[in-house]
């Protein structure tokens, strides 16, 4: 099976967890796009979807799936999103698509966070994929210097602006031995809006697409 077929299999499996719930949080990315396409088939069974990006909102609307604002709902029943990396502790690296801040907000608001991935995203130690951080534009150079102090190599994602009007620094060559600690350190740098580590609040469930089928892992 191709990587795209594995992504699609994981996304399709996630549909069973959102049937007959009120509000579904929807992430951003190529794997999530398969989920949105499948969600369209059961859109009559949900009240609405909270989108983590403009791109996701547009795709939901193309399928005539009702989109609701997070401020207008009291609960998000399930949040479904992909990841750029994951490890055995359910810690994730996310934000390759630049939507990390809104993704993190909806994941925190949701009762359950289901991460859909293909097996190629599994790593022993996070950091092989560059870690994105969303930064207020005026703080970009300052934050970059602080990242260098942490032994990372920050690269400005030129020509990209987040849906929140900010910029992205991608941190390369950073071996993340303690994701929970590093997430807090990065968040405490003035000018950082959010970073792509989902360790303080990891995924609740992993749906992993493999050639042998989709594996479900639940965090204990």
Swiss-Prot record:
GO BP: D-ribose metabolic process; pentose-phosphate shunt, non-oxidative branch
Alphabetical list of Pfam families matching this protein: Rib_5-P_isom_A
Organism the protein comes from: Coxiella burnetii (strain RSA 493 / Nine Mile phase I)
Coiled-coil segments: none
Binding site for substrate: 28-31, 81-84, 94-97, 121
Keyword Transferase: no
Keyword tRNA processing annotated: no
Family (UniProt): Belongs to the ribose 5-phosphate isomerase family.
Active-site feature positions: 103
Gene3D superfamilies assigned: 3.30.70.260, 3.40.50.1360
Keywords (A to Z) from UniProt: Isomerase
Function: Catalyzes the reversible conversion of ribose-5-phosphate to ribulose 5-phosphate.
Record EC number: 5.3.1.6
Single annotated GO MF: ribose-5-phosphate isomerase activity
InterPro entries reported in the protein's UniProt record: NagB/RpiA_transferase-like (IPR037171), Ribose5P_isomerase_typA_subgr (IPR020672), Ribose5P_isomerase_type_A (IPR004788)
GO cellular component labels: cytosol
Pathway(s) the chain acts in: Carbohydrate degradation; pentose phosphate pathway; D-ribose 5-phosphate from D-ribulose 5-phosphate (non-oxidative stage): step 1/1
Record protein name field: Ribose-5-phosphate isomerase A
